[in-house]
């Protein structure tokens, strides 16, 4: 983004870093990031002719943004270009030119730094009066072919200078960035690499980490000073955040809540978020149904589950948490210094109240700085890196937190463990989906000062009593398994048996109490994952599919932290029971699909399902972590709960009436439905077929439960027999046809 007519008081990068001038870009009344220009200044930038703006703003042909001599080495992450690393993998930069590419060997620098993609947000012919002359072939100051010939991907999204793009266009750009980051590092540029570039990177951070808009703006400005310049650009990031909120909602009755939708509406939302192969694969099938059916078959066949690395998100979350915390704290400290008023006695209650009432600079939207993963998921705060902040808050900051508490909000400064322990004591599920009440928190000022910014250091984890059910795998460890081997066996009992000659499964509470044994937080995550650099996953309590055995995980080398220990040294390997036959495993998986959970405590399953509902609503990483859930009853209950919470049944009364009236042939009946309907139904029926030959009563139970979930009609209701007879005939014929096709393909 061209910087336009820069304010006379704009500080250079070095000044911003040394004097922390970032706070100057915050609105003093609301504490939110403020635009860099006045309203009049913004208006002028839209009416001044381009050649005049270039001459007045950056020197015309002597454009400072294309002159490396104007920038320090610190401001040239890529030598020869005004550039900054916003994250370890995303580079914000001014536009390069053919002259600079050759003189500073920028393409070689890109390859050396691992940059595999360059994203250009300019329009051809833009800023023709700035810096180097434009290349006639491309309309830019360089030829894109120069990068592409070197194996670097090139994308161009034309974005008007000082303008904003549509939300759907930004979403497309963000998805391209997401794909590009899977290949390597990404460089983004416009003209100066400040406005449009900053907006796109901030929107990507919102998309990838679910942080708030203001957090993203603060973070980008901290890494790339003077970024995101106009009111429209600030509003663009905030509206993009609001635009994503309903799209991410999986379970409408769980926090963060959204309006219930139909299957067709959900598939439209899903298409907005998915990209690449996954978008094509799941065009007409909900992701949760496809994934659960796949995991169920993996469990039945005892196949390994391959998990891709999700390292970028958690590491980035930790970096963002640290940077935003420091920036907001810095702003508060500078405001207090500017007031230059006498500090009342902090131990005098009267003076304390008076100071609070006279506090005229309060972050009225402080919840905007509260990280989403803290505000919604207090129990999952630990970042991958063990960041130990040696900071404390002043008395006025403590009163601000007290005010937020009185308004019913969760202060982001409250020690995480204290919030968690208190909230777990007050959680009472009130509906089918998990909806924890806002806890009434009690804490003293001394505890707050002592624990401020010490988020989930290893010593903060405590025991597993309050964490094992709602921990976060990817926010608790840096070692991400590439493959998780399902080696737990099926069991037909509720309790775990133990062979005398095998080690006894450990007591996790005692392990955490022994600092010599464990120095790294190993909080059990949903589905039995144990975060930390472990080589042996441990799960408790036992379920029919994994009782008495232990899965194996392989981790990449070289990622262990200094204070991490091998769990295999501290935790004995759980004993293995003789595995059930393949047929027995398939039958048990089918019973889970039919909701015949006679071997599992229903309350335990319900609790786990509610927890997963909350996880999937709140965190993108939950899709990866759920692959580690080894209890088919939990997986199937989760899938059916999603089907049942839709605004309308998958198969409506009108659909059943149509099938009855047309007396449709069973072979063609499903194709009379909408494509999303029959593809969703076929996904479940294919899962049943893949379980191979099942006892008649088990298969019958699977079909009956599927009909009940898809129609929301009970068999004993008024039209129940007609609905069940019609659909059962169609479903059974589909199963027979699929089995016949499978048999023919093998012969």
Curated annotation (Swiss-Prot):
Gene knockout outcome: Elongated cilia.
Residues that bear Phosphoserine: 392, 394, 543
A molecular function GO annotation: protein tyrosine phosphatase activity
Active site, per annotation: 190
Ranges in a coiled coil: none
Biological process annotations from GO: cilium assembly; smoothened signaling pathway
Protein name: Protein tyrosine phosphatase domain-containing protein 1
Organism: Mus musculus
Gene symbol of the encoding locus: Ptpdc1
